[in-house]
């Protein structure tokens, strides 16, 4: 199994959304085309650093490959709905697991504290982001993203509208967690100059 096939195998919710709309033969053919498109992108961007490739290979390039392939066949509007529905269903599933975890004693405080080291490692300069980090306050974490590889590479690949979906996924994951409030006033994907991120205990 190739690298692109392994990645696409993990995108079952996207395939299911396509299957709901199209005959199986057509869905399977488009999925194969998207897989091949992903392989091309992997080769084209093979020199990207490891931290950045975590985002491009697991999220950005598969989404672009699926969306652009669908767009050519079923049109932009329907392709966008497929991507939005599958992404938000994935985010909702993550939120459900997170809610269960946060109901355990002490987990809300630990969750907030974990964000500083987590974002610096996974969403810092080594992963293609540019950030403004704010001083830590008890029970609160704040950070701004002023440059984002999702916005950059989706735009470069001709599908900047997908960035908005990625921004929306955060709202689905963090927007209704027990004992925590997620605050955001703007995102790069929605035309803002930054993605401001604040999560705090309430």
List PLM regions with ranges.
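Short amphipathic alpha-helical segments
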Residues: 58, 62, 78, 162-166
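Secondary-structure boundary/capping signal
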Residues: 26, 78, 181-182
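N-terminal, charged low-complexity regulatory/assembly segments
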Residues: 1-70
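Generic structural motif
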Residues: 33, 129-132, 182
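Amphipathic interaction/junction segments at domain boundaries or subunit interfaces
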Residues: 69-157
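C-terminal non-catalytic interaction appendages of large macromolecular assemblies
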Residues: 139-142, 148-202
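Hydrophobic, Leu/Ile/Phe/Ala-enriched alpha-helical segments that form helix-helix packing faces
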Residues: 18, 70, 122, 170-173, ...
